[in-house]
Amino acid sequence: MALWGGRFTQAADQRFKQFNDSLRFDYRLAEQDIVGSVAWSKALVTVGVLTAEEQAQLEEALNVLLEDVRARPQQILESDAEDIHSWVEGKLIDKVGQLGKKLHTGRSRNDQVATDLKLWCKDTVSELLTANRQLQSALVETAQNNQDAVMPGYTHLQRAQPVTFAHWCLAYVEMLARDESRLQDALKRLDVSPLGCGALAGTAYEIDREQLAGWLGFASATRNSLDSVSDRDHVLELLSAAAIGMVHLSRFAEDLIFFNTGEAGFVELSDRVTSGSSLMPQKKNPDALELIRGKCGRVQGALTGMMMTLKGLPLAYNKDMQEDKEGLFDALDTWLDCLHMAALVLDGIQVKRPRCQEAAQQGYANATELADYLVAKGVPFREAHHIVGEAVVEAIRQGKPLEELPLTELQKFSPVIGEDVYPILSLQSCLDKRAAKGGVSPQQVAQAIAFARARLG
């Protein structure tokens, strides 16, 4: 069933119809389209287009259709309707006859689809927020269980300073908290209803759009009809949030892929999230993490694609906007799947503490401590930095860690070095001294875990 046709004397070419139709992807808006139609039927009563009895009949039929869709959503794709709006209206007419043809009075598919998509976005943001917080909780739990797992921290993929696995987990909690905040901010801006804006100039019926927005669960109604039907900022914002969120998950995956290598050996992944090789029987591949990392690109592509689609569009609605859905659906589905998978990876991870500690003791990760020790003895930091660099070169030459160089050797680089230097060079001392807010000291990590637990509830 087409919602237009009187203007045309020829039928659409089937090739054009296939090119133009959107039901194959906008079927996902079925529930939102039906909910929006129920609200619109109520609004039509207030302006005398429908009687209360007619509205009740329409609402009952729409609610039955809603249950049918929830029970068997695949039925929608069996239709040759142009889009989800055509499908819903056609099914409604099948149920109530001519009365169904009155529902679209004063409404355009332009404000209808804008409303449907915003309702879908609100529902999906709620799912994303739940999944995000579940992953944050999984990271906090992993941090709680690994506060004593000392490991090397890296810059430039070179061992830099000792940290703990707990501190590493909490770094990703911070990233995910920002992702959560971005979603909440986006939700505030998309929580305005475009329904009642018509094709572009507004509806000719004196409908209370604020009341209509409230029936649909929106905070308010939009203020300008031209903007309302052409606005896709919420699509861009959610795609941007997804793109940033997927970058965080990709970095998380890359870290764990490295930690899981034979060369690092800091963690072992569960059999539940790894796979084997068809040729090499010894292999245990981190496929879940590699797929998270790999899927990041498609989400970035969806954001870029939508930016390019919108950049040259004049006001108001253009068919180009039909391209807003496939990329958005795929990007948010992908992000949601990856959030769930990241939590599953953490659920079975094993941290190999002895190997982590062994690696932390290598690479002269305590060199900064020696520099700070010299500063405490009155040596200017830049001079101390140079002195320690020379000491590291000598330690490398001898094949020893700094703490195994004899005092006489260390004093060749600076006479202020005394026996009290050796406790300073221990891993525990390296951690304990990082006691400022946000640092890796046990006290700060414990406080960060407690703060995250309280915030997540």
UniProtKB/Swiss-Prot annotation:
GO terms for MF: argininosuccinate lyase activity
InterPro entries assigned to the protein according to its UniProt record, in alphabetical order: Arg_succ_lyase_C, Argininosuccinate_lyase, Fumarase/histidase_N, Fumarate_lyase_CS, Fumarate_lyase_fam, Fumarate_lyase_N, L-Aspartase-like
GO cellular component terms listed in the entry, alphabetical order: cytosol
UniProt keyword list: Amino-acid biosynthesis, Arginine biosynthesis, Cytoplasm, Lyase
GO BP terms in the entry: arginine biosynthetic process via ornithine; L-arginine biosynthetic process
PROSITE patterns the record matches: FUMARATE_LYASES (PS00163)
EC category: lyase
Pfam assignment, any one: ASL_C2
Reactions the enzyme catalyzes: 2-(N(omega)-L-arginino)succinate = fumarate + L-arginine
Pathway assignment: Amino-acid biosynthesis; L-arginine biosynthesis; L-arginine from L-ornithine and carbamoyl phosphate: step 3/3
This protein's record includes keyword Lyase: yes
Main location: cytoplasm
EC number: 4.3.2.1
Domain of life: Bacteria
Keyword Membrane: no
Gene3D superfamilies for the chain: Fumarase/aspartase (C-terminal domain), Fumarase/aspartase (Central domain), Fumarase/aspartase (N-terminal domain)
Entries under NCBIfam families matching the protein: argH, PRK12308.1
Homology family: Belongs to the lyase 1 family. Argininosuccinate lyase subfamily.
Alphabetized HAMAP family for the sequence: Arg_succ_lyase
PANTHER family to which the protein is assigned, alphabetical: ARGININOSUCCINATE LYASE (PTHR43814:SF1)
Protein name: Argininosuccinate lyase
Organism: Escherichia coli O157:H7 (strain EC4115 / EHEC)
